[in-house]
Amino acid sequence: MLTLYGETFPSRLLLGTAAYPTPEILKQSVRTARPAMITVSLRRTGCGGEAHGQGFWSLLQETGVPVLPNTAGCQSVQEAVTTAQMAREVFETDWIKLELIGDDDTLQPDVFQLVEAAEILIKDGFKVLPYCTEDLIACRRLLDAGCQALMPWAAPIGTGLGAVHAYALKILRERLPDTPLIIDAGLGLPSQAAQVMEWGFDGVLLNTAVSRSGDPVNMARAFALAVESGRLAFEAGPVEARTKAQASTPTVGQPFWHSAEY
């Protein structure tokens, strides 16, 4: 079970809703994955009740999955705050995935503006899930601002590279043991999702890896199983890696010279 801001969710997978081949494939993918939440950009659905936006919103409601609006595309504090406030009105929720991009090529979050925007939104009653880097100090500043969960990236959005800074992510997990950490962006394979879950991360958010795959519906299922398996492995307590071989069969009854070291 995933707990965020005091609310419990049955799944540790969050799923984006952009760039699917058809609305029907999106709906089937969501139903197959059964995610905790589905993310959506206000700019994607439109605002003002036009036909396209209303139809997309109706499709999301049909899934029965809670919606997590995001501020995708925002590059200033004011823009992000305004978008979040509009999203609250449109989707009738205090949840917001806060995105504030600082570089157009890498789509890397601007952590300085991110902290400022998070402070404003939290004071305004939002439940903020900030998309951030794996930088420990930046993450601490976001927690100081009032965030109760973080969404560090594995790699730049849409790259599918997996956890490119594994050491930093592991340190982040180690140093923030009580903070829900959801890996957001950069995962391309179910095995990569399972890996970060095995490290102890609390959840995974995906979009491109599913929506742009050859078969989004089956890929959604694959990722859902990977996230579940990775978490189960973490909770089971994996054996530690070692450099020396260790027999798994008992040695009782074997000749004494079998235990000699050469």
Curated annotation (Swiss-Prot):
Compartmental location: Cytoplasm
One matching Pfam family: ThiG
Pathway the protein acts in: Cofactor biosynthesis; thiamine diphosphate biosynthesis
Catalytic machinery residues: K97
MF terms (GO), sorted A to Z: thiazole synthase activity
Catalytic activity: [ThiS sulfur-carrier protein]-C-terminal-Gly-aminoethanethioate + 2-iminoacetate + 1-deoxy-D-xylulose 5-phosphate = [ThiS sulfur-carrier protein]-C-terminal Gly-Gly + 2-[(2R,5Z)-2-carboxy-4-methylthiazol-5(2H)-ylidene]ethyl phosphate + 2 H2O + H(+)
Listed CDD domains: ThiG
Keyword terms: Cytoplasm, Schiff base, Thiamine biosynthesis, Transferase
EC number: 2.8.1.10
Top-level taxon of the source organism: Bacteria
Top class in the EC scheme: transferase
GO CC annotation: cytoplasm
One GO term of the biological process aspect: thiamine diphosphate biosynthetic process
Annotated SUPFAM superfamilies: ThiG-like
Binding site for 1-deoxy-D-xylulose 5-phosphate: G158, A185, G186, N207, T208
Protein task: Catalyzes the rearrangement of 1-deoxy-D-xylulose 5-phosphate (DXP) to produce the thiazole phosphate moiety of thiamine. Sulfur is provided by the thiocarboxylate moiety of the carrier protein ThiS. In vitro, sulfur can be provided by H(2)S.
Assembly and binders: Homotetramer. Forms heterodimers with either ThiH or ThiS.
Homology family: Belongs to the ThiG family.
Full protein name: Thiazole synthase
Name of encoding gene: thiG
